Amino acid sequence: MATAGEESQTQAGRHQEVGHKSLLQSDALYQHILETSVYPREPEPMKELREITAKHPWNIMTTSADEGQFLNMLLKLINAKNTMEIGVFTGYSLLATALALPDDGKILAMDINRENYELGLPVIQKAGVADKIDFREGPALPILDQLIEDGKQGSFDFIFVDADKDNYLNYHKRLIELVKVGGLIGYDNTLWNGSVVAPPDAPLRKYVRYYRDFVLELNKALAADPRIEICMLPVGDGITLCRRIS
């Protein structure tokens, strides 16, 4: 039988690997949050899409339910209308956003895999918010460059990024121009399941260690960027909110 210390080490190790969306060191506490605050108030379309996504072999890529709830409320609080999402997967966070926007709200959504998006599209359509979404398949950087060339600077109220971590800084260089002064950019996975503080010899998977270096670089750059105010939150896998101030 494992000792209390061994069980603690096992749980700590699990939280250093991508595969557990909560950064809380207690699974029971996270379950309490979901069962008392998140699931009872989760819109039916989001519940349906979450359950569909859970069957996907890469379901860990989805936004967690508590983070979806957070994004939905945040968008309402800032009265967002024109938004952008880089990295869609099956569309759980996209649906959370679409449900929060007014009837004339818009989301420019980008992902390299349309097939995953189409898995959730029937739910989005049934929820009556598909007309708010302009989905574009392919790499985001060329689209962002075109937006800047077309003079769309300062036209977005909120931008959510949950995509390739090795391009986060490249995204930021462009998004800081596209978000309005007073608008928000949200970068997901900025605590990378706790691996950002794992010791150098921690037994991390190769891709976890690889992307961790980019996440650490991003966190350092955001903290030093005078054009934004930042707030890093331990929601989901860590989300850093950046409010453009200049």
Curated annotation (Swiss-Prot):
Pathway note: Aromatic compound metabolism; phenylpropanoid biosynthesis
Chain residues that bind substrate: K21, D162, N193
Record keywords, A-Z: Lignin biosynthesis, Metal-binding, Methyltransferase, S-adenosyl-L-methionine, Transferase
Binding site for S-adenosyl-L-methionine: T63, E85, G87, V88, S93, D111, A140, D164
Binding residues for a divalent metal cation: D162, D188, N189
E.C. number(s) listed in UniProt: 2.1.1.104
PROSITE patterns on file: SAM_OMT_I
Molecular function per GO: caffeoyl-CoA O-methyltransferase activity; metal ion binding
Top-rank EC class of the record's enzyme: transferase
GO biological process, one term: lignin biosynthetic process
InterPro entries: Cation-dep_OMT, SAM-dependent_MTases_sf, SAM_O-MeTrfase
Co-factor binding details: Binds 1 divalent metal cation per subunit.
Keyword RNA-binding (UniProt): no
Ranges annotated as spanning the membrane: none
Reaction catalysis annotation: (E)-caffeoyl-CoA + S-adenosyl-L-methionine = (E)-feruloyl-CoA + S-adenosyl-L-homocysteine + H(+)
Gene3D superfamilies: Vaccinia Virus protein VP39
Listed cofactors: a divalent metal cation
Function: Methylates caffeoyl-CoA to feruloyl-CoA and 5-hydroxyferuloyl-CoA to sinapoyl-CoA. Plays a role in the synthesis of feruloylated polysaccharides. Involved in the reinforcement of the plant cell wall. Also involved in the responding to wounding or pathogen challenge by the increased formation of cell wall-bound ferulic acid polymers.
Family as reported in the entry's similarity comment: Belongs to the class I-like SAM-binding methyltransferase superfamily. Cation-dependent O-methyltransferase family. CCoAMT subfamily.
Name used for this protein in its record: Caffeoyl-CoA O-methyltransferase 1
